[in-house]
């Protein structure tokens, strides 16, 4: 099968598709055409006035070869619920879209669980030449799921095409660490991927694009990506540490004998590695400081931290695979924390750019810190944070690791020659 082909709803065979052209010319590099597009057209004016869509007509596959089955349908927005108000279509790109994490995530995105039940969505799926057939299979499953909010699905292997006009980029795809691979080598290999994707986002994505980096090592990959995308505010880049936060909440709830909805103000400081700092000093259980509820200081300082750090490895030992489903849930949580207002007094953890932070953490790295949002996609760092010597000492250890990683990838961030001196291996279990 050629790479410029699309699935035809008329039958199981593949039909040739003409090469497409991108609106934003990129003379410095050759372009591939989008490999396939699944699109549901919506009239924006009618959308604002009339409400929910009803399928009334389907174009012939020959006239719209980019269509994928039912997504060739045109919706008549005058036909149904007059009180329903659709928001503007949100374009979401997902890299590593044929992987296990994405397999859980994409259906949550399409269902409205993430952005809301009045938010139409377009999914733009980035893969590789090797994963292209799997991407077609993903698109077929999305088609069969009949999500009314899912208006477009496109698949491709060129980030300059897939990232066109995206509002959110969820960068999951990264090379796993192979047997005998040095951590410095993994930083370089994955760093190249995120440098290229940063350049593509810089060239063609929305200027207000929100970027969530999941592929590991995610903090430094996020730094590389933002350094290669100066057209997008550095504040818009995030490294996923929400799964670590969720794991910490679970352990505190178990120890206190409460359900986890009673646990708040949990922070993961630092790197997504075994130097991460689950913060129990500021955490609360049912509105009370954790140290007032859990009086076992030795457990908090030792077992709690180690349990959170090693949770992924234990899961692999039990199940034989890494935590794809819970990672997808944590991505949903991370996005929702930015698009819905933070509950009063609470905060959430996300890896963000440190320049200008109020805590004294080194600038110009991506570091997980406590944040609050008004629900507009923006955030502010929490100011009402307690700090003691025990917490600060561990924060500085994670900071030192990220500064060392930054030196390893200086050639990818425009800061000269790389120098790599990583004295210990702190990759989280399951990521080696």
UniProtKB/Swiss-Prot annotation:
Disulfide bonds join 67-72, 408-420. Its EC number is 1.1.1.82. Keywords: Chloroplast, Disulfide bond, NADP, Oxidoreductase, Plastid, Transit peptide. NADP(+) binds at residues 96-102, 190, 214-216. One of its GO terms (cellular component) is chloroplast. Gene3D superfamilies: Lactate dehydrogenase/glycoside hydrolase, family 4, C-terminal (3.90.110.10), NAD(P)-binding Rossmann-like Domain (3.40.50.720). Signal peptide: none annotated. PROSITE patterns: MDH (PS00068). The record marks 67, 72 as: Activation of NADP-MDH. Chloroplast NADP-MDH is activated upon illumination. In order to be enzymatically active, disulfide bridges on the protein must be reduced by thioredoxin which receives electrons from ferredoxin and the electron transport system of photosynthesis. PANTHER family: MALATE DEHYDROGENASE. Belongs to the LDH/MDH superfamily. MDH type 2 family. The chloroplastic, NADP-dependent form is essential for the photosynthesis C4 cycle, which allows plants to circumvent the problem of photorespiration. In C4 plants, NADP-MDH activity acts to convert oxaloacetate to malate in chloroplasts of mesophyll cells for transport to the bundle sheath cells. This is Malate dehydrogenase [NADP], chloroplastic. It comes from Zea mays (Maize). The lineage of its organism: Eukaryota, Viridiplantae, Streptophyta, Embryophyta, Tracheophyta.
């Amino acid at each position: 099968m050629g790479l410029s082909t699309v699935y035809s709803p008329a039958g199981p065979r593949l039909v040739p598709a003409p090469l497409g052209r991108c609106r934003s010319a990129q003379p410095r590099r050759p372009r591939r055409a989008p490999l396939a597009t699944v699109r549901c057209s919506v009239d924006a004016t009618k959308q604002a006035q009339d409400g929910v869509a009803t399928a009334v007509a389907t174009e012939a596959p020959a006239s719209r070869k980019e269509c994928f089955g039912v997504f060739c349908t045109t919706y008549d927005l005058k036909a149904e619920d007059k009180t329903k108000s659709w928001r503007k279509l949100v374009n979401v790109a997902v890299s590593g879209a044929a992987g296990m994490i994405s397999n859980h995530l994409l259906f949550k995105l399409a269902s409205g669980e993430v952005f809301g039940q009045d938010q139409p969505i377009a999914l733009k799926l980035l893969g590789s030449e090797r994963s292209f057939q799997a991407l077609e299979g993903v698109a077929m499953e999305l088609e069969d799921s009949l999500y009314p909010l899912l208006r477009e699905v496109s698949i491709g292997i060129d980030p300059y095409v897939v990232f066109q006009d995206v509002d959110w980029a969820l960068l999951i795809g990264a090379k796993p660490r192979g047997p005998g691979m040095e951590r410095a080598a993994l930083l370089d290999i994955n760093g190249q991927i995120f440098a290229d994707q940063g350049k593509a986002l810089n060239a063609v994505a929305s200027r207000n694009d929100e970027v969530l980096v999941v592929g590991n090592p995610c903090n430094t990959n996020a730094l590389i990506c933002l350094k290669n995308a100066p057209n997008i505010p550095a504040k818009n880049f995030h490294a996923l540490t929400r799964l670590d936060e969720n794991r910490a909440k679970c352990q505190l709830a178990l120890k206190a004998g409460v359900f986890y909805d009673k646990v708040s103000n949990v922070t993961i400081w630092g790197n997504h590695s075994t130097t991460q700092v689950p913060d129990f000093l500021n955490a609360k259980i049912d509105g009370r400081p954790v140290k007032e509820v859990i009086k076992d200081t030795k457990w908090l300082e030792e077992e709690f931290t180690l349990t959170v750090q090693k949770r992924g490895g234990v899961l692999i030992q039990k199940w034989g695979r890494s935590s794809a489903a819970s990672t997808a849930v944590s991505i949903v949580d991370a996005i929702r924390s930015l698009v819905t207002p933070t509950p009063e007094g609470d905060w959430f953890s996300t890896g963000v750019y440190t320049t200008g932070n109020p805590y004294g953490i080194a600038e110009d790295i991506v570091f997980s810190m406590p944040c609050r949002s008004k629900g507009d996609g923006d955030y502010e760092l929490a100011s009402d944070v307690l700090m003691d010597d025990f917490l600060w000492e561990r924060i500085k250890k994670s900071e030192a690791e990220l500064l060392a990683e930054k030196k390893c990838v200086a050639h990818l961030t425009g800061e000269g020659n790389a120098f790599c001196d990583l004295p210990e291996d702190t990759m989280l279990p399951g990521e080696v």
